C-alpha cells in the first residue's frame, strides 16, 4: 500500500518545499520509490516548455520516479498570489476531482507520495474549497513544517489543532530554521516538542542557499512515521 503524506506549513515562506525535498530524499535513502506532488502552485515563470514553478521543479527533481512536469503540478499560475484569486481571475477553476485524479496516478506508480500544499492549512482553492478540505477528503496524514521564528509556537499549535479537528493524523513535524538561530532557539524547539502532539522528525538548519540537488535528507529521521523507515526497494517503474 502506498504511503501518502500531506505537507502543510505554519505560514507561507516557512520552507515547505525545502522540507518536502528533504523528506523525499530521506524516503529514497530508505529504499522507496517516491513521487512529489505539488497540485497547485502560483508564482510560476514562463519557459520554452510553458509555465514552470520552482517548487514543483524541486519536487520533480527529488522524486525517484521520472515524472512529467504536468504529473507533478497540474495547476500552475504565474501571478504570485493566493490560488483562489488568480484561478478566478483567469477563469480556470481548481477542481478537487482533478487534484485527486493526479494523486491516484502517482499512487499507482510510487510507493511513497508526498503532497505539498500551498501557503498554510486553510489556503483557499476556490470560494467553496480549501486545501484542508481536500486533504480531509483524501484522508491524508499531515506533516507540519514549522518555520522557526518569532510567533511560530502559536501558529504551530493552532495548525496542529485544526488538523486534528479535521479528523486527520498529524504524522509528524519538521523544524525549519528560516532565519539564523537566535539566543532562545533551544527554548523555542523545546516548547514546540512539548506542545505539538506529533513526533519530531528533525530540524533543517539555517541554509542561505538551497538548490534542488542539495543533500538535506540526512537532517530528518522518518522512523517515527512507521513503515517508511524500513527499506523497501521496488522494481523499476515507467515514467508517469
UniProtKB/Swiss-Prot annotation:
Keywords: ATP-binding, Biotin biosynthesis, Cytoplasm, Ligase, Magnesium, Metal-binding, Nucleotide-binding. Its cofactor is Mg(2+). Substrate binds at residue 42. GO terms for molecular function: ATP binding; dethiobiotin synthase activity; magnesium ion binding. ATP binds at residues 13-18, 55, 116-119, 176-177, 205-207. Signal peptide: none annotated. One of its GO terms (cellular component) is cytosol. Gene3D superfamilies: P-loop containing nucleotide triphosphate hydrolases. Pathway: Cofactor biosynthesis; biotin biosynthesis; biotin from 7,8-diaminononanoate: step 1/2. The active site is at residue 38. Belongs to the dethiobiotin synthetase family. HAMAP family: BioD. It comes from Pseudescherichia vulneris (Escherichia vulneris). Homodimer. Mg(2+) binds at residues 17, 55, 116. It catalyses: (7R,8S)-7,8-diammoniononanoate + CO2 + ATP = (4R,5S)-dethiobiotin + ADP + phosphate + 3 H(+). It holds the Pfam family AAA_26. It is found in: Cytoplasm. InterPro entries: DTB_synth_BioD, P-loop_NTPase. Catalyzes a mechanistically unusual reaction, the ATP-dependent insertion of CO2 between the N7 and N8 nitrogen atoms of 7,8-diaminopelargonic acid (DAPA, also called 7,8-diammoniononanoate) to form a ureido ring. It is an enzyme of class 6 (ligase). PANTHER family: DETHIOBIOTIN SYNTHETASE. Its EC number is 6.3.3.3. This is ATP-dependent dethiobiotin synthetase BioD. GO terms for biological process: biotin biosynthetic process.
Amino acid at each position: 500500500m502506498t504511503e501518502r503524506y500531506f505537507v502543510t506549513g505554519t505560514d507561507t515562506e516557512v520552507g515547505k518545499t525545502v522540507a518536502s525535498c528533504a523528506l523525499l530524499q530521506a524516503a529514497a535513502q530508505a529504499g522507496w520509490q517516491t513521487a512529489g506532488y505539488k497540485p497547485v502552485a502560483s508564482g510560476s515563470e514562463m519557459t520554452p516548455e510553458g509555465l514552470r514553478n520552482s517548487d514543483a521543479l524541486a519536487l520533480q527533481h527529488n522524486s525517484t520516479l521520472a515524472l512529467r512536469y504536468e504529473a507533478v503540478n497540474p495547476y500552475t499560475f504565474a501571478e504570485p498570489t493566493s490560488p483562489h484569486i488568480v484561478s478566478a481571475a483567469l477563469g480556470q477553476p481548481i477542481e478537487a476531482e482533478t487534484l485527486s485524479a493526479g494523486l491516484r496516478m502517482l499512487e499507482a506508480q510510487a510507493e511513497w507520495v508526498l503532497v505539498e500544499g500551498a501557503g498554510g492549512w486553510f489556503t483557499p482553492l476556490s470560494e467553496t474549497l480549501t486545501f484542508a478540505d481536500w486533504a480531509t477528503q483524501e484522508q491524508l496524514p499531515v506533516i507540519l513544517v514549522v518555520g522557526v521564528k518569532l510567533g511560530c509556537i502559536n501558529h504551530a499549535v493552532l495548525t496542529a489543532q485544526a488538523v486534528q479537528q479535521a479528523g486527520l493524523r498529524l504524522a509528524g513535524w519538521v523544524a525549519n530554521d528560516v532565519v539564523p538561530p537566535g539566543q532562545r532557539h533551544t527554548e523555542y524547539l523545546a516548547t514546540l516538542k512539548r506542545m505539538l502532539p506529533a513526533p519530531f522528525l528533525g530540524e533543517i538548519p539555517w541554509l542561505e542557499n538551497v538548490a534542488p540537488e542539495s543533500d538535506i535528507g540526512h537532517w530528518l529521521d522518518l522512523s517515527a512515521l512507521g513503515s517508511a523507515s524500513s527499506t523497501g526497494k521496488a522494481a523499476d517503474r515507467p515514467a508517469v
